[in-house]
Amino acid sequence: MMAAIQASQLTLDVVLIEKNSYPGRKLLLSGKGRCNLTNNCDLDSFIARFSGNGQFLRDAFKKFFNQELIRFFEDRHLSLKIERQLRVFPETDKSDSVLEVLKKALNKNKVKIFYKTAMKDILLKEDRVKGLLLSDGSFIAADKIILATGGLTYSFTGSSGEGMKIAQRLGHHLVPLRPGLVPLETKQQYPKILEGLALKNIRLNFCDGKRKIISEIGELIFTDFGISGPLVLSLSGKIADWLSENKSVYVEIDLKPALSKEQLEARLFREFELNAKKTIKNTLKALLPKKLVDVFLDLAKIMPEKKVSQIMRAERQRIVSQLKALRLDISRCRPLENAMITRGGVSLKEINSRTMESRLIKGLYFAGEMIDVDADTGGFNLQAAFSTGYLAGESAAVEPLGL
């Protein structure tokens, strides 16, 4: 939509092909229905949140970055707010408010929208765009075409990768598609018992064999198949890469990252002195969420009704060790249909970063999730979609045909 809006600012004849009966179905789901539009951090910090290809977006961000996006919506009477970690949301907390602004901009610019229309192929003449063949057999002549069809996630919204398939048929290389911002499955079954339990301000130490490869603090949520939550999602891309190399990956959850092992042992010793007549189960409720206690003791091989005064030194040491390193072995990432974004896509080597035009086909442009860039949660991916869409739309409208 942003590509069509910007292109129609600069040229008269813009057509938007929409597979669904209304636009923006995927946008409505973003930010859990609240639409995390962007992030208010500086450019270098923003680019650092991408998984390795963020520098490709520097030209697009210089043209249309977070402040320009914020102005775009505020100039159209949508108030925005900045929340923790500099995440930007509409004041309404509703993604349909964002969609409404975009729809009005399309209407104002007289963009012609074909609803319930799917594309079948792009036709070329001497490596130059000639037009678009639709699924009903009709043909739309076009000098410029912008492909912004998204990835493979949330396929029920109509995002099923047609644009990538067409790009590949036209000779573009696709970096293998894989899930990003995705929950992780574990070999152990106890997360199912803890389903829904959120642990905040814990440290996750991901390990490859005996080597610690990531160590970050954040929030984790147990699920019926393993673990999820903001921290898990943001690290899942790296985990997926290691798993694809057949590496053995496990995570140690540090439930008390503010305390060293020695400090924690001293704290536990004090708790035991104060609660000698209580059961270990009741005593640990001062240190752990109630829902976690039984599972924790089962893993430590300690009877929950055992009196604190009966706890042996070796058992106390097991408790401390487990508080600092509750282990889960990662079996795999959830499949693409459970991911928030698609990693991979059209190779950046075949896209001009200054225009978003294909280096292989004149008049063909790319934008959004279908190109090989991806980032953490926090508004980074949506800003990349808006920025590449804006740049592609502007470039398509003003770039000469080069005949």
Where would I find each of the regions flagged by the language model?
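Feature captures the FAD/FMN-dependent oxidoreductase FAD-binding
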Residues: D59-K144, V293, L297
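A glycine-rich dinucleotide-binding beta-alpha-beta segment and adjacent secondary-structure elements
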Residues: F114-K116, D121, D294-D374
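Short hydrophobic core segments
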Residues: V15-I17, M119, L132, F139-S159, ...
